[in-house]
Amino acid sequence: MRAASRHVDYGKNRLLAALPPDEIERLLPTFQQISFSLGDVVYESSGHLDYVYFPTTAIISLLYTMENGSTAEMGLTGNDGVVGIALFMGGGTMPNRAVVQSAGDAIRMKAKVLQAEFATGGEFQRLLLRYTQALITQISQTAVCNRLHSVEQQLCRWLLLSHDRVATDELIMTQELIADMLGVRREGVTVAAGHLQDIGAISYVRGRIQILDRQKLEDTACECYRVVKDEFDRLLK
């Protein structure tokens, strides 16, 4: 993680872009734009949170790590939301890790600044609470999907959610990383990705996934993707 340019492009984050001009004017001096690399740890499980992060081009995964070291993704956040909800929900720490899934930029804000603004009860508070409701839906639906649906359906859901949160058709990630996110064996991801290539939905070369036909991904995915997308669109439109 490193500081980016002084220019703060808050308009690329849906939550910040939805704020009224007077709130943005008040908050803008508190924003700092930073750049994340793939694999950067945003926060550790039960670690103290000093900042919240509003991704603009980065995607951040919320991961749960078991005692035996195995991991699974609970949810992901990109330009649709914020990382560090415990700071305004009253907890202060999170039981999961937050790790950068796709390199890019984010805007961070100090915890005390966010908490003070949240306490004013304005539009910022309303948006953060609505985002939290949408995130709860994503986490819940991920649990259902991981329990009931095939690896291929899970992979389609995951690719679509990731694609929604970046401004490109290319996703840079390895099959090993995807397997860790889904909590499945790498071999299962290899087979699923191979079939998606065969039907022309994606291409995969050396850690680079190109979305070739999004409609085919949507047709192959289970209902879980649409449930999550519809809820985000409803709450954050």
Functional labels for PLM-detected ranges:
Residues A18, L76, R108, I172, ...:
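Short aromatic/basic micro-patch
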Residues M1-S37, V82, L87-F88:
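Cyclic nucleotide-binding regulatory module and flanking cytosolic helices
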Residues G75-R130, T137, Q141:
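Cyclic-nucleotide recognition modules
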Residues D22, T57, K112-V113, A134, ...:
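Alpha-helix/helix-capping structural signal
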Residues L160-K237:
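Phosphate-/nucleic-acid-contacting segments
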Residues D40-S102:
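Cyclic nucleotide-binding regulatory domains
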Residues S102-A103, E117-R185:
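Polybasic "coupling" helices that flank or enter modular domains
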Residues I59, G104-A106, R208:
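Structural motif
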